[in-house]
Regions:
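Phosphate/NTP-binding elements of NTP-utilizing enzymes
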Residues: 1-198
């Protein structure tokens, strides 16, 4: 994520995409003063859960790495270096009026009215020449804005850098795991949840 302004990640379920992303967000906020990081998810509770993961990571950092916290609540963390991390549900006004340096959109293929949200959010992104965007999601059919951005990234027609995490990239997942998962669900469900199939 560090070398790319726009990153999009297509990843299978339970592959660590969210936890890896929020670890990067914490690093960014700690080591880049006076930055605002926004975590937006399809539900406010999900965004809050990611902020809770960041709080837990923060508590487990070695003492010499722990930044001072000026404020810590269920929706935001403010650090002594004047950086902050905020969390909210994806809605048209969730970050309106804010200056965002890093925007993280989690499970973006599952956001209702995502195209409308993205349209209303893009001015915040484009207002800063260095604003970073990280989008992660499991596939959720074709035609949605996540699918369109992903396909554009793969084809090289937009500025997003595509990253993909397949089921076999996850430690402990092998052909036996795949066969067992399909027998307990279905091929269609496997393809949707783990196969990165649109």
């Amino acid at each position: 994520f560090t070398n790319n302004r726009f990153s999009i990640v297509l990843a299978c379920r339970q592959s660590g995409k969210s936890i890896s992303s929020v670890a990067y967000l914490l690093w960014f906020a700690i080591f880049h003063p006076e930055k605002t990081v926004a975590i937006l998810a399809n539900k406010g509770a999900t965004a809050g859960e990611m902020l809770a993961r960041i709080t837990l990571m923060l508590e487990h950092l070695p003492f010499f790495l722990q930044p001072g916290c000026r404020a810590l609540n269920k929706r935001s963390i403010e650090f002594s270096n004047n950086s902050r991390i905020i969390s909210a549900a994806t809605s048209g006004d969730s970050i309106r009026g804010l200056s965002i340096n890093l925007l993280y959109l989690d499970e973006f293929a599952f956001v209702e009215r995502a195209a409308e949200f993205y349209t209303s959010t893009y001015p915040v992104i484009s207002s800063g020449k260095d604003t970073k965007v990280i989008i992660t999601s499991t596939a959720n059919g074709i035609g949605n804005i996540f699918h369109k951005i992903w396909e554009g990234a793969v084809q090289g027609v937009n500025e997003y850098k595509p990253f993909r995490v397949d089921w076999w990239d996850v430690p402990g997942r092998d052909e036996k795991w795949k066969d067992e998962t399909i027998s307990n669900t279905s091929q269609l469900q496997f393809d949707q949840e783990f196969g990165n199939t649109f």
